[in-house]
């Protein structure tokens, strides 16, 4: 095992992965400390899912709810009625990390956390109509020291503060995770109610089609929320979700509620002023077929031939291209890929890629503002569509369709869209899913699509022990 010297925050020291046991990453979620967060790559050592990030005990935090932004450090709580993205600049002043000379490591400490979908009300003039059922913050972002796992090279990097002490940081981290235990036995309630009946959802689709026909918008995502009882800790649910639904970008965030995400979709990446977004529109569910890649490609071709899905994908790519153009150098924005097939465990997606070169005067918070929330989970045009979503969906979306990721000290950012999304809160499990609606959508089919997306998540939490859960559709 490689030794790891205790250094200043400006020094990242590598540790061989064998300094941890196999269950360490599971126990990282079960932390007795405050604000534990885990951003994890599960689908392999590709460039897009190379690193997993573990953070504990923030140096300073910024939280926003409604019109109030709270900046918190170890000594004080400062309330500021301001744009929460601007507040990130203030929380960065609490840290003292200079970027290291390890240029290959993009995240060397910084602000990590999430922005709920509803934070858009602070960024755009959007009416407030939906019921605020979930009371979590609209933004929860903090500065952290961190542990970084490189899947490609099987190396752990530890970033530690100057005052951490004399113990080898690898030993300190190993002592921490080995002190935790994990119990995989828990129950999920037999029935999950929905905030839509099938008739009400179909009526919502019809109303959306009226808006589409009048030219208010060109495509929209309509979501429904499921809720049921659980007897489990949120970290237990996360580990079960990770096993049942592995994805390139997974997240566990302990900020008031337990937020659990398995996302295949990047909303915005900035590496050395190179911008990248990867919208997903088009999904093939079920594990890869026995016929192999050729049969799967045939299924993808069939999907591409569906006019409704083709129209949806083209509109979303155009929306993301416009978002990148707001912060990109003129003439640099390119659609690098459109409708490419990517395979994951249990699902295949049709993915596009839009890139551009960042304008020199643009800061990290400006990038988030330009691309938030992701167009695949709102619709086009974005602001008008969000107003209509607020009118039709019974509750606010909260974290669903928001974003999770980081802004690094060195200036780069990486955020993913929070889909699929589970919340564990006060003995209840909330699950939210939706689907894209266009002019030729069939209301009953749209209801079934969104309902089954939620059911797939809930069933996945039970598959590990072979339990049978009766799912309900409230009529």
Swiss-Prot record:
Enzyme class: transferase
Pfam families per record: Anth_synt_I_N, Chorismate_bind
GO molecular function: 4-amino-4-deoxychorismate synthase activity; magnesium ion binding
InterPro entries (UniProt xref): ADC_synthase, Anth_synth_I-like, Anth_synth_I_N, Chorismate_C
Cofactor(s), names only, from the UniProt record: Mg(2+)
Record keywords, A-Z: Folate biosynthesis, Magnesium, Transferase
Catalysed reactions, semicolon-separated: chorismate + L-glutamine = 4-amino-4-deoxychorismate + L-glutamate
Lineage top rank: taxon: Bacteria
A biological process from GO: folic acid biosynthetic process
Enzyme Commission identifier(s): 2.6.1.85
Function field: Part of a heterodimeric complex that catalyzes the two-step biosynthesis of 4-amino-4-deoxychorismate (ADC), a precursor of p-aminobenzoate (PABA) and tetrahydrofolate. In the first step, a glutamine amidotransferase (PabA) generates ammonia as a substrate that, along with chorismate, is used in the second step, catalyzed by aminodeoxychorismate synthase (PabB) to produce ADC.
Family statement drawn from the similarity comment of this UniProt entry: Belongs to the anthranilate synthase component I family.
Protein name as annotated: Aminodeoxychorismate synthase component 1
Organism of this sequence: Streptomyces lividans
Organism taxonomic ancestry: Bacteria, Bacillati, Actinomycetota, Actinomycetes, Kitasatosporales
